[in-house]
Amino acid sequence: MSESLKILNNIRTLRAQARETSLETLEEMLEKLEVVVNERREEEQAMQAEIEERQQKLQKYRELLIADGIDPTDLLEAAGASKTGRAKRAARPAKYSYVDDNGETKTWTGQGRTLAVIKRAIEEEGKSLEDFLI
């Protein structure tokens, strides 16, 4: 809630402000506030009417499906089966081969950070990345 709304919601603050404001101004403010409240009520009623209309339509369609001998859950399952998820991409093939600290030969695709073993070999042993190509 914003500070201005907190002030409007506090009766003590309103009374203090009302003492310094003319009655005509207070009545104008009251009229404007009533207009805003009425608009908001109408919006809420319209939204509620839309929700009720949607529920009635859903119930109508449910009844039509049942009358035709179709179970609504079967329809949902059929709709769910037709949707396809995001396809996984294929794993990238290995591009580099190296021997780790345990003496095992391993591979690396070349994606991500340079592996510590390869980085150490490049920096300390003077090798290049091309030396590790498969």
Swiss-Prot record:
Tell me which Pfam families the record gives. Answer: Histone_HNS, Histone_HNS_N
Q: Where in the cell is it found?
A: Cytoplasm, Nucleoid
- What InterPro entries does this protein's entry cite? H-NS-like_N, H-NS_C_dom, H-NS_C_dom_sf, Histone_HNS, Histone_HNS_N
This protein's record includes keyword Transcription = yes
Q: Which residues bind DNA?
A: 111-116
This protein's assembly is summarised as:
Homodimer that oligomerizes on DNA into higher-order complexes that form bridges between disparate regions of DNA compacting it. Interacts with YmoA and other similar proteins.
The entry assigns this protein to a family as follows: Belongs to the histone-like protein H-NS family.
| UniProt xrefs under NCBIfam families | PRK10947.1
What's the name of the protein? DNA-binding protein H-NS
